[in-house]
Amino acid sequence: MSETRPMSPLRKFYWWLRWYEPRFALAYTLIVLAGWLWLGWPLLWPGLVALLLMGLAVDSVVRAGSSWFIATVSRGPRGGDAVALSFDDGPDPQVTPAVLEQLKRHGARATFFVIGRQLAAHPELGRRIVAEGHVVANHSWQHSYLQNFRLREWQTAEISRAERAIEEVTGQASTRLYRPPVGMKTGDQARAVGALGLKVIAWSVHSRDTVDPDPVSMARRVLRHIRGGDIVLLHDGDRVPGRRQSCAEAVRLILEGLHAKGLRAVTVPELLGYPPPRAQEPLPERLEALP
């Protein structure tokens, strides 16, 4: 099993901000109040407005569920017994097969947001995912952390390349579901996604497996917060092959916990009431219509 590389304090702080949004809101409020005291009354309102606008700008880009640039779906309707497990950054031949085995054993369905070049390198896993009743969706071609800030033309090519890989490997039309790398969104990315007719899918429950990959801790975090309608984020892939091997055990514990709670795991399209992949318009027709 691959060892997990220790995270730098700066990166740990970054993930803390991203996945603990209520605490982020509290921290930001304290910053605004501190700015109020520092600026004094004469500059109170201009200073507060500037700080609030800065916070909104950061939130619109960084928060995965933000719909500032493009409509983003983070969960399904409440009140039911369905939830959706989603897996990012795969497929990984050292991890994904074990995850699929756990899903099969528990009669669960899931959605795999794949990196295009990973799918092209391991097409047999993509075909297996679909054959076993799961859904393959788009997580970009190469998962560059800077790609979210590139111009529209570059992002259109990057995303559509992954779309074509999905269609070629699975033999199905694309699901039209896209999850940006690390969940960030920008104006140019939104225009590219909109031109391709994709729906942006985020999540409402994060396993925080990128920070703490212990399967018991991952399952505990998910089961503590999950309710009907939630979309859960996990990772079956990483830049270092095999690093997410704890994912399969976490999936087992999560599925057992869901059963105890009376919840069932379905695909994202099923949770959201979207049509199945075969009912979608082929991607090349959409691309020919681009300006």
Predicted regions and their residues:
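Active-site beta->alpha N-cap acidic-glycine motif
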Residues: 59-147, 158-161, 165, 174, ...
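His/Asp/Glu-enriched short active-site or ligand-binding loop at hydrolase and phosphoryl-transfer sites
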Residues: 14, 184, 189-226, 263-274
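Short low-complexity, flexible loop/linker segments enriched in glycine and/or proline
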Residues: 115, 126-129, 152-154, 216-218, ...
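A short, flexible beta-alpha/helix-coil linker loop
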Residues: 142-144, 206-207, 237-240
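Acidic-and-aromatic substrate-binding clefts and catalytic sites of carbohydrate-active enzymes
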Residues: 90-94, 114-122, 145-153, 179-186, ...
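Short, flexible/disordered intra-domain loops and linkers
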Residues: 240-247
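N-terminal pre-catalytic segment of deacetylase/amide-hydrolase enzymes
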Residues: 2-85, 93-101, 105, 256, ...
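CE4/NodB-like, metal-dependent polysaccharide N-deacetylase domain
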Residues: 100-114, 134-135, 151-184, 191-195, ...
